[in-house]
């Protein structure tokens, strides 16, 4: 069994002070960095929301389900990884959402166009741990797509931050129903 870590959207615009801030995002960035000092994965990847023209994904009157305030514009500080996240151990970054809404890291690709699932398979990965921001949106979508792609999947809940308790609970129920393991802490 070969396992990879997928760090989802730990970016400035999703942390405190950002355009679509999630409470606890900066702390999660630091906790992931601490975890990276002691974990042992065959590969470590990260995703980045990276919008050029996402069309209807952005709205001046967002519903926070299908539409959102503008965020993570390509080549802006908001799209950068949060400074609390140690990016040195990351083997590859997958960019998503350039021209449409993209919640899952599996909708992203490297700068040379390699899709996440393909990249993981070339590394012999069969299991993934997923963490990051937001538990109830992009972490959820990435974990569900990992299962759909055939990877054994676990969400590291203590290394993730979500938008609201109610939507986190709904997301966790959906993940469990899909066969995703929920690890309450990194020792799980």
Predicted regions and their residues:
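Histidine-anchored nucleotide/phosphate-binding helix
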Residues: 35, 137-148
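Short, well-ordered alpha-helical scaffold segments within catalytic/effector domains
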Residues: 29, 113-117, 140
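Surface-exposed beta-strand edges and their flanking turn/coil or helix-capping segments
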Residues: 59, 106-109, 143, 168-169
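Active-site acidic carboxylates
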Residues: 1-99, 148, 152-155, 163-188
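A generic secondary-structure signal
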Residues: 34-38, 118-122, 145
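Internal catalytic-core helix/loop-beta-alpha segment
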Residues: 75-133
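Short active-site-adjacent structural elements
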Residues: 103, 137-141, 162-165
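Glycine-rich anion-binding loop/nest that anchors nucleotide
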Residues: 125-138, 155-160
């Amino acid at each position: 069994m070969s396992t990879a870590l997928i760090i989802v959207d730990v970016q400035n615009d999703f942390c405190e002070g950002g355009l679509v801030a999630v409470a606890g995002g900066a702390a999660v960035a630091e906790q992931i960095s601490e975890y990276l000092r002691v974990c042992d994965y065959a590969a470590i990847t990260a995703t980045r929301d990276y919008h050029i023209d996402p069309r209807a994904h952005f709205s001046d009157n967002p519903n926070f389900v299908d539409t959102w305030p503008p965020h993570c514009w390509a080549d802006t500080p908001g799209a950068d990884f949060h400074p609390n996240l140690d990016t040195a151990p990351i083997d590859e970054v997958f960019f998503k959402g350039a021209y449409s809404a993209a919640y899952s890291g599996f909708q992203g690709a490297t700068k040379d166009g390699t899709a996440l699932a393909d990249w993981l398979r070339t590394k012999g990965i069969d299991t993934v741990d997923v963490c990051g921001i937001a538990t109830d949106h992009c972490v959820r979508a990435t974990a569900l797509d990992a299962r759909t792609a055939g990877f054994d999947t676990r969400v590291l809940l203590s290394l993730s931050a979500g938008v609201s308790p109610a939507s986190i609970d709904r997301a966790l129920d959906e993940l469990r129903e899909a066969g995703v393991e929920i690890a309450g802490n990194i020792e799980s």
